């Protein structure tokens, strides 16, 4: 690939007290084999009080204080509006790029196909040296096991090598081109992805107050912008949370972003109007309560990759069942007593 045909990029990172992971994230960005004059470094910060902003400054990022503090989704919407370039590399502060070719690999689908909307990695990176929960997420390809069982993950489990969701229209040695509809669109838009700014601004409900990183791409799919790429590489997601912290974080996330009446969802991981989704949700509850299916899935994964982190799966299923249940009860109470 010649540098003269490489597109300009805006690297967008949203932050809130991310000093623990940020330096590792930014070092990997700085090491990319990509012309520096083609890269804008943009940060939208939600009110950090640790060393986050100083670290960003050292690495050459332009930091903007969010007008909607403490809301990562709104920060993404603000960054979308402020970006100078059309291709946005969206990274969280706990995402680490595994090689210096990552930018080049991720933009290739956009160079090859002018209708391309979004590109994400095939896997999360698995590293035996990582924490057990990070390894679990990388092994199963999801943070949320409900997504795994309903069948809408945006990454594959480590033992899965072929992408089958949606309508596969082209496969190369480097990536898969897929057309999605609203029934097959996975949970895209976050943790190491590249997407087009122009389409989101013109055709999606991308105002910061309403921005949700999956829903804006559902807006595009609904309007006929259906071409997505699954790039055959990976990205590290360093969640590094304890299991109690995970439960607390997930309840807050669901209550804040996904169960509020003020946010009209255009994308539903579980659509209560669809019988198939209802059945899959009931099966997830049954699987979690009985433990049998999660243990079988753990054993299958362990057969391919000998990492005991697979067997965290039954525990994570219980945590998420509790988190969704607690958030749903909280929403019901608000309806009844507000």
Language model features: what each stretch is:
Residues 1-28:
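N-proximal low-complexity "stem/linker" segments adjacent to membrane-targeting elements
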Residues 88:
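Short aromatic/hydrophobic "clamp" motif used to bind/position activated sugar donors
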Residues 27-38:
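Short, acidic, metal-binding catalytic loop of nucleotide-sugar glycosyltransferases
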Residues 251-255, 269-338:
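Non-catalytic, C-terminal membrane-associated alpha-helical segments of glycosyltransferases
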Residues 101-158:
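Conserved donor NDP-sugar-binding/catalytic core segment of glycosyltransferases
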